[in-house]
Every structure is written in structure tokens, then in C-alpha cells.
């Protein structure tokens, strides 16, 4: 079983006692870095539709990439989901569970294990650069071949790689019941979903979850597994009625 998650756009480069010196696909990562080093500030600004400041910072990141600080992937990404994984609370046994089961999808690195060393970067799968889905197609297909996959990634990173997989992943969704015009509807809220995706990863590590049935027992912040809203392709966890 493999759990897939998205990277974060923010970083705090931090070390872990045990780290992998090389990532899984070092040569292809280096090829992308070489291409990015040739980009001008104006080209980066156009590609990302970003401010001068972001383009200049990213330009410097790639120019200095080979000597930039490196840290453990699971501790160096600093988005909401990663903060709520709370990996610093996990002992070695639980971290080893994550190293075996958790995979981070990345535009630059392709697929990252938790202990892989990374540097700060900016490159998403949907950037107007090259088709990174096709660039990483063989690695994605081969790495996940035959695996049961739990999808805790954003749509950009998760569902867009489904066509390269031999087994359909199980998507995890978190929804709230809300009252709209007298009817109860299910609504997904971005920030609570990111928090819960992080907490679910922590839960899976603490409980050494190995299958879907075990995962259905997850309960957090009022969200519980909803059989009637779930099917073979997704597990839905619902928080009971909140008026809106």
C-alpha cells in the first residue's frame, strides 16, 4: 500500500537523523534543474504569471541549486498538511512506516520518499514549462505498479496521474454537512481538508494502517467515515450538520 500526497509551496529546510543521500530519480531531477538554470527572470515570470520578486527569488534558487541547503523532505515541506502530520511527535518505528508507505509527488523530483533530501524549489506539475506528467510517466507507472494507493493529494497532483496507474487509487475526501435553503448539502472546505489530510497521515503512521478497512476507523475533529457517501473509488469522511 502506498499513500500519495502533494508537496507544499513553502519550505523550512530541516534535517532528520536518517536521510537518503539521493532521491529516487536523481538523473531526471538534475536534467530539470539544468533546464531551469537556463531560464531568465523574465521567462520565469511569464511561466508562472508571478511577481518580479518571486521570479527573482526562483532564479537565484536554481542558479545556486547545487550548493543550496538540503533537508529531509517530510520535515522540509511546510504547508498546512505537513504541519498537521506532526512528524516530530513520531518515533523511529512510525517514521519507518512513512518511509515505506508515504510518497510525495513532485514536479521537480517526480516521487519523493519521506527521508529523501531536497532543496527549496519552485516547479509544479501544471506549470507552463514542459508536460511534467508525461516527463514522469514511466517512473510513476513503474513505482506504483500493483500497489493499492490511498490518495491524500490535491487534485492537481493526485487525480491527474491516475491514467498512468494500473490500479485505481482510493481518494480520501472530507466534507461538512451544511444547511442551504432548507436542504442538507455536503461541502468541502479547503483548509479543514488540508488539516485532516495531515492528521490522517499521522494516524496511519501511529496505527500502522495496512488496508482500507482499518482506515475507515479514522475519526477526527467531528469527521467520521460515511458509508453511504463512499464507494470503491473514494472514502468520504463527514462532519455532521453545521448551519450556514
From Swiss-Prot:
This is UPF0246 protein FMG_1068. GO terms for biological process: response to hydroperoxide. Pfam families: H2O2_YaaD (PF03883). PANTHER family: PEROXIDE STRESS RESISTANCE PROTEIN YAAA, PEROXIDE STRESS RESPONSE PROTEIN YAAA. InterPro entries: YaaA. Belongs to the UPF0246 family. NCBIfam families: PRK02101.1-4. It comes from Finegoldia magna (strain ATCC 29328 / DSM 20472 / WAL 2508) (Peptostreptococcus magnus). It comes from the Bacteria. GO terms for cellular component: cytosol.
Amino acid at each position: 500500500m502506498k499513500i500519495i500526497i502533494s508537496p507544499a509551496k513553502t519550505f523550512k529546510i530541516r534535517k532528520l537523523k536518517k536521510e537518503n543521500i539521493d532521491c529516487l530519480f536523481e538523473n531526471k531531477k538534475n536534467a530539470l534543474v539544468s533546464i531551469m538554470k537556463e531560464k531568465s527572470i523574465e521567462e520565469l515570470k511569464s511561466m508562472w504569471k508571478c511577481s518580479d520578486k518571486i521570479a527573482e527569488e526562483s532564479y537565484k534558487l536554481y542558479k545556486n541549486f547545487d550548493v543550496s541547503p538540503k533537508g529531509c523532505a517530510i520535515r522540509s515541506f511546510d504547508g498546512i498538511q505537513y504541519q498537521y502530520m506532526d512528524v516530530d511527535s513520531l518515533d523511529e518505528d512510525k517514521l519507518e512506516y512513512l518511509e515505506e508507505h508515504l510518497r510525495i509527488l513532485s514536479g521537480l523530483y517526480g516521487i519523493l520518499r519521506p527521508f529523501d533530501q531536497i532543496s527549496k524549489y519552485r516547479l509544479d506539475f501544471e506549470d507552463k514549462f514542459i508536460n511534467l506528467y508525461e516527463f514522469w510517466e514511466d517512473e510513476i507507472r513503474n513505482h506504483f505498479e500493483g500497489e493499492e494507493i490511498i490518495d491524500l493529494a490535491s487534485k492537481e497532483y493526485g487525480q491527474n496521474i491516475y491514467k498512468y496507474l494500473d490500479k485505481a487509487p482510493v481518494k480520501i475526501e472530507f466534507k461538512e454537512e451544511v444547511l442551504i435553503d432548507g436542504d442538507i448539502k455536503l461541502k468541502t472546505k479547503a483548509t479543514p481538508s488540508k488539516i485532516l489530510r495531515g492528521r490522517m497521515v499521522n494516524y496511519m503512521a501511529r496505527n500502522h494502517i495496512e488496508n482500507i478497512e482499518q482506515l475507515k476507523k479514522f475519526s477526527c475533529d467531528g469527521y467520521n467515515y460515511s458509508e453511504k457517501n463512499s464507494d470503491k473509488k473514494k472514502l468520504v469522511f463527514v462532519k455532521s450538520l453545521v448551519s450556514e
